[in-house]
């Protein structure tokens, strides 16, 4: 068994748990977690959250105290601009989500996270997660890879917004994430692509012709 922070965790049947659990699968894509590390990591995802469509997972000005794993459902992250809401990202089944700047800096969030459908999530407390990161190098490596992937995605998106036409941005998104057009309302996609809804509708219509 493994003893850590007054927890005693048996390691029997860890193999079957790993094979079935998508959280462990995602971490193992980035780092070679041992069975003990996998078991410990999984034991802290204890908070279950259920959201209805339009419910908020995180609100602006509130501190982000959790990292979430989406079991089912679709959510959007948006910035509450005075003139209009600016969609900055979306998350789906089997992915992680949080108000990232707030989670990392331990400061109030500037963003809202809202359910676009019925959602079921698991959550780990921020303090518990960073204890794991600080005490287990394999978990720290996986977290670093997740952060690096997010940073690369942000840079690539910024370049697309600055250099591509609205039509080209649409085509890139369709190629990269075709599922978004089935899961997310068109007005939010238009906001994410920094284009008018009418332009998005026109490009969508043109794509269907081809």
Where are these regions (language model features)?
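Phosphate-/nucleic-acid-contacting segments
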Residues: 9-10, 164-210
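A cytosolic small-molecule/anion-sensing beta-strand core signal
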Residues: 52, 71-72, 92, 117
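Glycine- and acidic-residue-biased ligand/ion/polar-headgroup-sensing regions
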Residues: 65, 69-76, 94
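Short, Lys/Arg-enriched N-terminal segment that forms or immediately precedes the first helix
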Residues: 150-159
């Amino acid at each position: 068994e493994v003893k850590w922070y007054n927890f005693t965790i048996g390691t029997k049947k860890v193999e079957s748990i790993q094979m079935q659990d998508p959280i462990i699968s995602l971490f193992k894509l980035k780092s070679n977690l041992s069975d003990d590390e996998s078991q410990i990591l999984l034991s802290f995802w204890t908070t279950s959250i259920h959201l209805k469509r339009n419910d908020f997972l995180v609100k602006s000005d509130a501190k982000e105290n959790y990292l979430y794993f989406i079991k089912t459902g679709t959510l959007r992250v948006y910035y509450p601009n005075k003139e209009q809401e600016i969609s900055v990202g979306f998350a789906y089944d089997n992915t992680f989500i949080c108000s990232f700047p707030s989670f990392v800096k331990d400061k109030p969030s500037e963003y809202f996270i809202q359910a676009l459908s019925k959602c079921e999530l698991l959550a780990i407390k921020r303090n518990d997660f960073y204890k794991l990161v600080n005490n287990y190098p394999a978990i720290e490596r996986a977290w670093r890879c997740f952060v690096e992937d997010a940073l690369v995605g942000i840079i690539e998106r910024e370049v697309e917004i600055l250099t591509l036409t609205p039509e080209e941005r649409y085509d890139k998104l369709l190629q990269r994430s075709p599922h978004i057009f089935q899961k997310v309302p068109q007005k939010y996609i238009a906001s994410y692509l920094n284009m008018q809804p009418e332009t998005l509708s026109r490009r969508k219509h043109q794509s269907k012709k081809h």
